């Protein structure tokens, strides 16, 4: 009989699948160094080879989409460093590795060190954006840490002279390649921070191999860049070259020339902006002056419409119309009187009664006298009313008020000043006098205190 709990029974397929999953899950991606042998490339474009050392060997495959990124042709017996995934080929149960990238052994070791240092500094937070310092805008002085004989310095100076010829540049010469280079770069950064001569630093060099650029993958250089109080722009190699210094720096430039463009101002662009600003300012000033002129013209015409002389001229015109009407009325009455007189004379001539003639003549004389008196009275009354109107107009005229020693004070917007709360110290005031204008500045404001009239004390009645 079978026991109650029998052990798990695997099929061959399940066994190979389980082993493959264990290898891929537990091992993950690893770096392997070894010597290439049995290298082959069939028509599919994939690479098949064996990696071996003195004691063991393992089958490898590198598919076409991965090997197209390799920059050299692998050779039999060549030492390489590969990054690969461990797996199992299930149909045959063969253990193998799938290669993702390949480098010659020398560069491969450097790349491995690069990845290890990058992971370490990432874990410490040296690459985080919150530690990045803002570059000065504009920069008043630029420091350059590079080789004094390299092409990078020439490119940087050429760009700075072209874009911003007046920008001061301080060069901190240092080696950028070799065993002494990291220490010299660190000392140059410390010297620049101690002197505080510039407000931005460019640290970099021209292009080269990974080994040539290795000084900028040094941990000491990375920590010196991170500790710098002066913002640093890294400019190492070409755009495809990425170093540890690029991650730590406050800003990465793809090339030294690009770094010079980043920290400098384009004088031609500044000049164009200034000219554009000047044009906008002139247009705004022209518009402002034109609007002020229109406003002044409107106020001038409005003031002219309300001028006392104009009002007096209107009154004189009205008075002249009244005088004409009065003259016409008098002439009309005189004509009617003459006509009545003629009719009366005709009747007298017809009847010729002498007494009635004498009486009629007396009556006519009386009427003429009364008419003349009436006309003189009405003329005198109209003259008196006209004189009173002229006197009243002169009494209420603002010019007459100014002539008596008074003045009218207004603030900048033309509002007549009536109370001290309308102004504050430093305001400009305009005062109209009889013969001109006075502009003044408020130095002090002193309100007049209101006094209350005392009630008379009650008098004691006389005993």
From Swiss-Prot:
Natural source organism: Klebsiella pneumoniae (strain 342)
GO cellular component: cytoplasm; exodeoxyribonuclease VII complex
UniProt record similarity statement: Belongs to the XseA family.
Gene coding for it: xseA
Keyword terms: Cytoplasm, Exonuclease, Hydrolase, Nuclease
Catalytic reaction equation(s): Exonucleolytic cleavage in either 5'- to 3'- or 3'- to 5'-direction to yield nucleoside 5'-phosphates
Name of the molecule in the record: Exodeoxyribonuclease 7 large subunit
PANTHER family, per the entry: EXODEOXYRIBONUCLEASE 7 LARGE SUBUNIT
UniProt subunit comment: Heterooligomer composed of large and small subunits.
Class of the enzyme per the UniProt entry, highest EC level: hydrolase
Chief location of this protein within or outside the cell: cytoplasm
Gene Ontology biological process terms, A to Z: DNA catabolic process
This enzyme's EC code(s): 3.1.11.6
């Amino acid at each position: 009989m079978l026991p109650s709990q029998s052990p798990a029974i695997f099929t061959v397929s399940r066994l190979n699948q389980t082993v493959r999953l264990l290898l891929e899950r537990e091992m993950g991606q690893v770096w392997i160094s070894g010597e290439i042998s049995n290298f082959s490339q069939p028509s599919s474009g994939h690479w098949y080879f064996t990696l071996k050392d003195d004691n063991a060997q393992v089958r490898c495959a590198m598919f076409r989409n991965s090997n197209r990124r390799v920059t050299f042709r692998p050779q039999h017996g060549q030492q390489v460093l590969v990054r690969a995934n461990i797996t199992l080929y299930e149909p045959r149960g063969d253990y193998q590795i799938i290669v993702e990238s390949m480098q010659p052994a020398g560069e491969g070791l450097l790349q491995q060190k690069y990845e290890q240092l990058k992971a370490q500094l990432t874990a410490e937070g040296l690459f985080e954006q919150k530690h990045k310092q803002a570059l000065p805008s504009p920069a008043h002085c630029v420091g350059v840490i590079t080789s004094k004989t390299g092409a990078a310095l020439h490119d940087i100076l050429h760009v700075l002279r072209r874009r911003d010829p007046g920008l001061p540049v301080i060069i901190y010469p240092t080696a950028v390649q070799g065993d002494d280079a990291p220490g010299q770069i660190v000392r140059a950064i410390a010297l620049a921070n101690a002197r505080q001569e510039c407000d931005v630093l460019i640290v970099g060099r021209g292009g080269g191999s990974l080994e040539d650029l290795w000084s900028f993958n040094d941990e000491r250089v990375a920590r010196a860049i991170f500790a710098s109080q002066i913002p640093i722009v890294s400019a190492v190699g070409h755009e495809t070259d990425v170093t540890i210094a690029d991650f730590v720096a406050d800003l990465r430039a793809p090339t030294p020339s690009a770094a010079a463009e980043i920290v400098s101002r384009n004088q031609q662009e500044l000049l164009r902006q200034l000219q554009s600003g000047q044009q906008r300012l002139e247009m705004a000033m022209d518009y402002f002056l034109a609007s002020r002129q229109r406003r002044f013209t409107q106020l001038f015409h409005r003031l002219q419409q309300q001028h006392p002389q104009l009002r007096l001229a209107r009154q004189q015109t009205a008075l002249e119309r009244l005088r004409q009407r009065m003259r016409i009325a008098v002439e009309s009455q005189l004509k009617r009187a003459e006509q009545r007189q003629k009719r009366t004379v005709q009747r007298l001539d017809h009847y010729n009664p002498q007494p009635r003639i004498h009486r009629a003549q007396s009556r006519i004389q009386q009427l003429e006298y009364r008419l003349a008196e009436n006309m003189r009275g009405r003329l005198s009354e109209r003259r008196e009313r006209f004189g009173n109107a002229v006197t009243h107009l002169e009494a209420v005229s603002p010019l007459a008020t100014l002539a008596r020693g008074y003045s009218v004070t207004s603030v900048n917007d033309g509002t007549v000043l009536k109370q001290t709360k309308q102004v504050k110290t430093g305001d400009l005031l305009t005062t109209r006098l009889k013969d001109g204008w006075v502009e003044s500045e408020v130095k002090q404001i002193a309100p007049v205190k209101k006094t209350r009239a005392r009630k008379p004390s009650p008098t004691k009645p006389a005993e």
